[in-house]
């Protein structure tokens, strides 16, 4: 595979290989056959980051080969959304001959939505000034005049310049309901929007008929919490990053959801609060003991859950676990399977044409 040519004709074979590999990994836990969710074969990534290469008078996007670290020129990127592909040549054309915008520019980040909004971040190895703001505004306005709904951000050491805003609002159809999600630049969002819809709808399906409340650790912008709220009496969710908490609060209001409570604290702190080990001022007015959380949702980083968190989640009758690394999921299941059984298993092809697998399991207490 090259950045400008996807092996679309090999997609089915690669997905079959992933399915077989996941089944083999999950066999020791008596898991059912995985439900497999296909990705679009192109234009599936809603965000992308590129280095900029200055080659004499020329300027172009590059990425680095993961094995050789050699640079690869990228003029189009079919893995990315059509909007990113439309913006890439327009950004180069607008910057190449503009000394103010080009000087010491080393990276461009694109974040887009299915609703055709974009945030473009320009990263520099120099201080940014009013001249930069003026030229960036001129380029942004030219793109808007051509129909692009785009926002610009300039970044340098300890500097972030927003020309107007640093977010865009995504709209996802989830099981018959349109969900609005504010996505903030430089904060985590699911990269494959089509796969995100599949994950949300699968999570809704496996939690149908749930009793009690839902607890989610590290909820980000509320991606899963808000979609799942319709299946539970109440949802209690924790998140540590301020921009994500702010986005989650906006999303609660935008979606007219009244049964989700976001708490800004780490999972370890939350465990201490639930167990009465410590009191936290930020929990004033929130009666944790009134929550009857029978289901816990976790979507940990590639490293999986640490042993303390594994012990904590074992206390819940139902565990919904989304994993971006089946290897660490299996390590966690070595412990979790002692108390819980795997009821449902799903494979989400979040990253086509790579070895990466995203999967989901629903665990129920034995």
Swiss-Prot record:
- The first-level EC class reads transferase
Q: Which CDD domains match?
A: AdoMet_MTases
Q: What is this protein called?
A: tRNA/tmRNA (uracil-C(5))-methyltransferase
UniProt-annotated binding residues for S-adenosyl-L-methionine: 190, 218, 223, 239, 299
Please give the organism. Cronobacter sakazakii (strain ATCC BAA-894)
Query: Which Gene Ontology BP terms does the record give?
Result: tRNA methylation
Q: Which residues are responsible for catalysis?
A: 324 (nucleophile), 358 (proton acceptor)
Give the matching HAMAP family: RNA_methyltr_TrmA
Q: Which gene encodes it?
A: trmA
């Amino acid at each position: 595979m090259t950045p400008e040519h996807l092996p679309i004709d090999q997609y089915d074979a690669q997905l079959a290989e992933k399915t077989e590999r996941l089944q083999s990994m999950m066999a020791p836990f008596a898991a059912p056959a995985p439900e497999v969710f296909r990705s679009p074969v192109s234009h599936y990534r809603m965000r992308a980051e590129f280095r900029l290469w200055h080659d004499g008078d020329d300027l172009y996007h590059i990425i680095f080969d993961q094995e050789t670290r050699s640079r690869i020129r990228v003029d189009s990127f079919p893995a990315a959304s059509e909007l990113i592909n439309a913006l890439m040549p327009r950004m180069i054309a607008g910057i190449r001959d503009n000394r103010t915008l080009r000087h010491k520019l080393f990276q461009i980040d694109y974040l887009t939505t299915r609703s055709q909004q974009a945030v473009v971040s320009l990263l520099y190895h120099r201080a940014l000034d009013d001249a930069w703001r003026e030229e960036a505004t001129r380029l942004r306005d030219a793109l808007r005049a051509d129909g692009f709904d785009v926002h610009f951000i300039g970044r340098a050491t300890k500097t972030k310049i927003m020309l107007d805003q640093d977010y865009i609002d995504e709209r996802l159809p989830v099981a018959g309901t349109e969900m609005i999600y504010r996505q903030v630049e430089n904060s985590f969002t699911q990269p494959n929007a089509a796969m995100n819809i599949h994950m949300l709808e699968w999570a809704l399906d496996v939690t149908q008929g749930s009793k009690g409340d839902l607890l989610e650790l590290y909820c980000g912008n509320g991606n899963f919490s808000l979609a799942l709220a319709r299946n539970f009496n109440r949802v209690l969710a924790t998140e540590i990053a301020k921009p994500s908490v702010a986005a989650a609060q906006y999303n609660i209001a935008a979606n007219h959801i009244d049964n989700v409570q976001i708490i800004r604290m780490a999972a370890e702190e939350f465990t201490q609060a639930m167990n009465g080990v410590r009191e936290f001022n930020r929990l004033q007015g929130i009666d944790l003991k009134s929550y009857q959380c029978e289901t816990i949702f976790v979507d940990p980083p590639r490293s999986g859950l640490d042993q303390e968190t594994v012990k904590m989640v074992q206390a819940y009758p139902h565990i919904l676990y989304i994993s971006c690394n089946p290897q660490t999921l299996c390590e966690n299941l070595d412990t979790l399977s002692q108390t819980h059984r795997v009821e449902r298993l799903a494979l989400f092809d979040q990253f086509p044409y790579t070895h990466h697998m995203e999967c989901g399991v629903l665990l129920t207490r034995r």
